[in-house]
């Protein structure tokens, strides 16, 4: 209601100030309008031009809704209805590809039954279905009963130099060219019809003006100079309006009161969408000027005229199915980029050979922690900033084109620019929303991590206030000696031929290169016999036997000890050995050597790597192949995300194979076999993206879900439950290192998402 009242007050004030319109025609201000307007004038207001434009817009409004230079209550009511402030309305916009639904805010059409219809309402042969909101020519019709009224239509493109340059008219001296510019036009039924429309982009930074003049069929044009080309610059437009002011000022005050309205049959009716700068400069006002009430009153008719003419509305609902433009990629780039990306990612397994000597150093633990955080940032960033927005790209593009009739009016270039601006704004809107989601994810990570650090700090402080560490060591030694005595007595009671395989010792076996880093596999199996002892004895033994094996993901292979706080790691340890026993159902009546167990473990682990990791690589290759068919920037973004999360993953797999007893050559071979599935996935993704575009959109959505799962389920818990304090490292150092990795991953994906349309690479064969 506040908006309605403000518009009514503006309109009332404008009509009150300009009510004696016939007196304004006799003022000398109109004869002194500047012929040429300099674009860099001093800050201020050109009053003459402002008054001219004010009269121009008022004349258009009075021509549409007035009668005999006056605006009746009925006409005023129709004006309010047309600008949408007569009552509260609900607007429902339906996107119908068969026929356009009429918008409720165009309900004022039913009130124009008394208008004299011109050929503006005639449908073009190539557009059989036009919605009501496409035609606003009813606003320019003459009202029934106005047959005695004459309209003035000066020819703005012709100076009529054959006439005398000066003459005297009425009470004052006026230029003769103004008299020559004035023409009497017949009734609108026999007048010429030339539709002129000038449109420019709404953006203030980019101006695009296009003039279209289309003679209506069945009408003959008259009094229009065909040799004069349409002016498309602001300077010529302002110059024409200046000549219009001088020509209109020739009307004598002593003449009988006539209509001052302009006819629509000229090029003066400029239906242009004014932005702030355009609105001020067209009225002779500097953009640095401070507007007072009088100067603002000059702008009121233009504002109301803009609302009434709906010059700034662009209907995005398309009558026909939007044509998807050809993709800006080549099949050669897709194959080349995908092959290079998969090859680089697959060669990461060789990096593990170089890092083998560093696996037991603190530096490697810090490096791996940073890589895990970087993988979380790139995976989640690629999912929310790139994959999900691209999965909605086809839907957004299908609604980004204008209606055919609007395209015909504004031209193909304007339609292309408008569609491009709408598509870019929609895409960046999705990008900012994805960035907001990443912000929420990062905030919760910070909260949980900080709370964990605070809790660990308090626990450490309480622990230091208890018994000295020496007393604790003495007590632990007593418990271990007690357990050893119980274990030796139990071994004497068991027949050597009936001992389970869990009792196998590694004393007679040759030590492995990794025996110094962690207990042997046979020592791991001893944990499973703990059910034969009291619970307290089991609890005493677990910290020793579970050392370096209770950690999840790939850190359990890198010689890291675990903290007793994480009881779920103990449970994970039990499940791991239960799974191992199910896959090795050996008889308990036999003794197996370490080499036999190692060989069986290698075979099982090799298949796990080839099938499990190979399936993961296939999904990565599928995503990379489909992304490269979307464009080089899209493929680059997905490749970076896959690279960052495969880097720690491949290092972990390589370490698992080596610690299981494989040689370096065997580990490299099995990783290479799993990488072959990545090439197969890449080829599948390229074929799908090239021949079935709609399917590639679903691949993007599926890949986004996979990336989010890997980041949030596999890697974030690894970041939150690190064992830095067990190695004498600062937990806060790990915290800041992980934050740096996450933010770096977010930043990489954000930069690629924003500037991906500028990443262009072409190959000509």
Curated annotation (Swiss-Prot):
Entry's Gene Ontology molecular function annotations: zinc ion transmembrane transporter activity
A GO cellular-component term linked to this record: apical plasma membrane
Residues carrying a glycan: 68, 250, 275, 292, 694
Domain of life: Eukaryota
Coiled-coil parts of chain: 475-495
Membrane-crossing residue ranges in chain numbering: 336-356, 366-386, 434-454, 668-688, 697-717, 735-755
InterPro entries membership: ZIP (IPR003689), ZIP_Transporter (IPR050799)
Topological domains annotated Cytoplasmic: 357-365, 455-667, 718-734
Regulation: induction: Induced during neuronal differentiation neuroblastoma cells line but down-regulated during myogenic differentiation of skeletal muscle cells line. Induced during epithelialto-mesenchymal transition (EMT).
One annotated GO biological process: zinc ion transmembrane transport
Basic and acidic residues bias (residue ranges): 96-135, 174-186, 248-257, 490-508
Biased composition (Polar residues): 224-233, 509-519
Subcellular location: Cell membrane; Cell projection, Lamellipodium membrane; Membrane raft; Apical cell membrane
UniProt keywords, alphabetically: Cell membrane, Cell projection, Coiled coil, Glycoprotein, Ion transport, Membrane, Phosphoprotein, Signal, Transmembrane, Transmembrane helix, Transport, Zinc, Zinc transport
Record region (Disordered): 96-196, 209-257, 458-519
Catalytic activity of the protein: Zn(2+)(in) = Zn(2+)(out)
Record's bilayer topology term: Multi-pass membrane protein
UniProt feature, compositional bias: Basic residues: 238-247
Phosphoserine modification, residue list: 481, 488
Stretches assigned to the Extracellular side: 21-335, 387-433, 689-696, 756-765
Tissue localization of expression: Highly expressed in the brain and testis. In the brain strongly expressed in the CA1 and CA3 regions, Purkinje cells in cerebellum and dentate gyrus in hippocampus. In testis found in spermatids or mature sperms in the central areas of seminiferous tubules.
Its job: Zinc-influx transporter which plays a role in zinc homeostasis and in the induction of epithelial-to-mesenchymal transition (EMT). When associated with SLC39A10, the heterodimer formed by SLC39A10 and SLC39A6 mediates cellular zinc uptake to trigger cells to undergo epithelial- to-mesenchymal transition (EMT). The SLC39A10-SLC39A6 heterodimer also controls NCAM1 phosphorylation and its integration into focal adhesion complexes during EMT.
Subunit structure as annotated in this protein's UniProt entry: Interacts with SLC39A10; which triggers cells to undergo EMT and mitosis. Found in a complex with SLC39A6, SLC39A10 and with the 'Ser-727' phosphorylated form of STAT3 throughout mitosis. Found in a complex with SLC39A6, SLC39A10 and with NCAM1; this complex controls NCAM1 phosphorylation and integration into focal adhesion complexes during epithelial-to-mesenchymal transition (EMT). Found in a complex with SLC39A6, SLC39A10 and with GSK3B that controls NCAM1 phosphorylation.
This protein's name: Zinc transporter ZIP6
Species of provenance: Mus musculus
Lineage, uppermost ranks: Eukaryota, Metazoa, Chordata, Craniata, Vertebrata
Gene: Slc39a6
């Amino acid at each position: 209601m506040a908006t309605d009242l403000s518009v009514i007050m503006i309109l009332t004030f404008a009509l009150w100030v300009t009510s004696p319109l016939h007196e304004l025609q006799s003022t000398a201000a109109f004869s002194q309008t500047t012929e040429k307007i300099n674009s860099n004038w001093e800050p201020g207001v050109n009053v003459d031009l402002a008054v001219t434009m004010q009269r121009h817009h008022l004349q258009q409004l009075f021509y549409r809704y007035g009668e005999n230079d006056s605006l009746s209550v009925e006409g005023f009511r129709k004006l309010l209805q047309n600008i949408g402030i007569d009552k509260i309305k609900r607007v429902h916009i339906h996107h119908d590809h068969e026929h356009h639904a009429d918008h409720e805010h165009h309900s004022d059409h039913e009130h124009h039954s008394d208008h004299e219809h011109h050929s503006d309402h005639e449908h073009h042969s190539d557009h059989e279905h036009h919605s009501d909101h496409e035609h606003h020519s009813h606003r320019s019709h003459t009202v029934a009963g106005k047959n005695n009224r004459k309209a003035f239509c000066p020819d703005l493109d012709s100076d009529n130099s054959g006439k005398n340059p000066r003459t005297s008219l009425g009470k004052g001296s006026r230029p003769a060219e103004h008299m020559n510019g004035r023409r009497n036009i017949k009734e609108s039924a026999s007048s010429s019809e030339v539709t002129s429309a000038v449109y420019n982009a709404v953006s203030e930074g980019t101006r695009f003006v296009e003039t279209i003049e289309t003679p209506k069929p069945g009408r003959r044009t008259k009094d229009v100079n065909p040799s004069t080309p349409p002016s498309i610059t602001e300077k010529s437009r302002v110059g024409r309006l200046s000549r219009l002011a001088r020509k209109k000022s020739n009307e004598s005050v002593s003449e009988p009161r006539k209509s001052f309205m302009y006819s629509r049959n000229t090029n003066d009716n400029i239906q242009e969408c004014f932005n702030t700068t355009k609105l001020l400069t067209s009225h002779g006002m500097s953009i640095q000027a401070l507007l007072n009430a009088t100067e603002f009153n000059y702008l009121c008719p233009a504002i109301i005229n803009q609302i009434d003419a709906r010059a700034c509305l662009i209907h995005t609902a398309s009558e026909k199915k939007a044509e998807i433009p050809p993709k800006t990629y080549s099949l050669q780039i897709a194959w080349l980029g995908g092959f290079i990306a998969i090859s680089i990612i697959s060669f990461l397994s060789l990096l593990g050979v170089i890092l083998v000597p560093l696996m037991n150093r603190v530096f490697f633990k810090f490096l791996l922690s940073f890589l895990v955080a970087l993988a979380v940032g790139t995976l989640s960033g690629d999912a929310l900033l790139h994959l999900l927005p691209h999965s909605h790209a086809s839907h957004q593009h299908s609604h980004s084109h204008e209606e055919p009739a609007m395209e015909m009016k504004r031209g193909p270039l304007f339609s292309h620019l408008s569609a491009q601006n709408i598509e870019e704004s929609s895409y960046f809107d999705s990008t900012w929303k994805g960035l907001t989601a990443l912000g929420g994810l990062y905030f919760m990570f910070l909260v949980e991590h900080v709370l964990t650090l605070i809790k660990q700090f308090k626990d450490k402080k309480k622990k230091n206030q208890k018994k000295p560490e020496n007393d604790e060591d003495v007590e632990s030694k007593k418990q271990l000696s007690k357990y050893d005595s119980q274990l030796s007595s139990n071994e004497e009671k068991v027949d050597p031929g009936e001992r389970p395989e869990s009792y196998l010792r590694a004393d007679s076996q040759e030590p492995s290169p990794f025996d110094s880093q962690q207990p042997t596999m046979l020592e791991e199996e001893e944990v499973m016999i703990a059910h034969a002892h009291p619970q307290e004895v089991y609890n005493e033994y677990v910290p020793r036997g579970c050392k370096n094996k209770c950690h999840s993901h790939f850190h359990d292979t890198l010689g890291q000890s675990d903290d007793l706080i994480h009881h779920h790691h103990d449970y994970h340890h039990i499940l791991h050995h239960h799974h191992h026993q199910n896959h090795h159902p050996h008889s308990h009546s036999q003794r197996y050597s370490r080499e036999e167990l190692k060989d069986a473990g290698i075979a099982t682990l090799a298949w796990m790597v080839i099938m499990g990791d190979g399936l993961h690589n296939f999904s990565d290759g599928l995503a990379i192949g489909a992304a490269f068919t979307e464009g080089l920037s899209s493929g680059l973004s997905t490749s970076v995300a896959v690279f960052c999360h495969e880097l720690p993953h491949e290092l972990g797999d390589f370490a698992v194979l080596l610690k299981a007893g494989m040689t370096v050559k065997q580990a490299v071979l099995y990783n290479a076999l799993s990488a072959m599935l990545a090439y197969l996935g890449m080829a599948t993704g390229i074929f799908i993206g090239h021949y079935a575009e709609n399917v590639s959109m679903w691949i993007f959505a599926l890949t986004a879900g996979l990336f989010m799962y890997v980041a949030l389920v596999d890697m974030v818990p690894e970041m939150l439950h690190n064992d830095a304090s067990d190695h004498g490292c600062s937990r806060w150092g790990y915290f800041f290192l992980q934050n740096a990795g996450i933010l770096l991953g977010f930043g990489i994906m954000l930069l690629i998402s924003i500037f991906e349309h500028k990443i262009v690479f072409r190959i000509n064969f």
